[in-house]
Amino acid sequence: MDLSSKPQQQLLNSLPIAGELTVTGEMGVCYKECLKNHAANLGGHALDGCGEFMPSPTATSTDPSSLRCAACGCHRNFHRRDPSENLNFLTAPPISSPSGTESPPSRHVSSPVPCSYYTSAPPHHVILSLSSGFPGPSDQDPTVVRSENSSRGAMRKRTRTKFTPEQKIKMRAFAEKAGWKINGCDEKSVREFCNEVGIERGVLKVWMHNNKYSLLNGKIREIEHGLCLNTHSNDGDGSSSS
């Protein structure tokens, strides 16, 4: 009694035979993602996102022009040719023998799908490298960035203390009396002077350091000018007496 059925026989006939030339490509050759540049006329680079060549149902191996991808519509030549990956062929399901004993399982095991199959395919969307027109970080005006940085630096900069003319006169008199050195002065007198003028000790110390040489040079020039005037007046008195 023949236990084989027609559906099982039809399934066996429809399976591809290992080593047979398929529509996908040559034996042991796979065609991966589509590399056709759809933005070549615009001077850019755009892919359609097709990750693997899918043969069209109407394609025949005798007509090369019919070898178009059913997913993206591009010819097989636009897809990346990968000869390193072999085609995986389906194995027929085990058929019960007439004696009722199960046949041993087939030793043919399909090779696992390589990891490069999942990582090599680009995302399924159009990738455009053309400029979108929106300002990015590199499109910002450098003057605006510099002005922002300068404004932050100005905020961090210490504000200068402004003194009234009366405060300047009193601080100059105190500095001349102390010899332009605050460290050698009596701390009690320094605190009393700072409370009287309305400044802090550190402010007085900085002011004395910044104005020591300028005011001393000005005072020296005043003394020299006075000596010159006295010399001229003495010369005039001597000439008139003679």
Curated annotation (Swiss-Prot):
GO cellular component terms given for this protein: nucleus
Induction: Up-regulated by abscisic acid and by drought and salt stress. Not induced by cold.
Keywords from the UniProt entry: DNA-binding, Homeobox, Metal-binding, Nucleus, Transcription, Transcription regulation, Zinc, Zinc-finger
DNA bind region: 156-213
Site residues (Required for DNA-binding), renumbered to this chain: M208
Intracellular or extracellular location(s): Nucleus
GO molecular function, one term: DNA-binding transcription factor activity
PANTHER family referenced in this protein's UniProt entry, alphabetically: ZINC-FINGER HOMEODOMAIN PROTEIN 11, ZINC-FINGER HOMEODOMAIN PROTEIN 2
Subunit structure: Homo- and heterodimer with other ZFHD proteins. Interacts with HIPP20, HIPP21, HIPP22, HIPP23, HIPP24, HIPP26, HIPP27, HIPP30 and MED25 (via ACID domain). Interacts with NAC019, NAC055 and NAC072 (via NAC binding domain). Binds to ZHD1, ZHD2, ZHD3, ZHD4, ZHD5, ZHD6, ZHD7, ZHD8, ZHD9, ZHD12, ZHD13 and ZHD14.
Name of this protein: Zinc-finger homeodomain protein 11
Naturally occurring in which organism (per UniProt): Arabidopsis thaliana (Mouse-ear cress)
Gene responsible for this protein: ZHD11
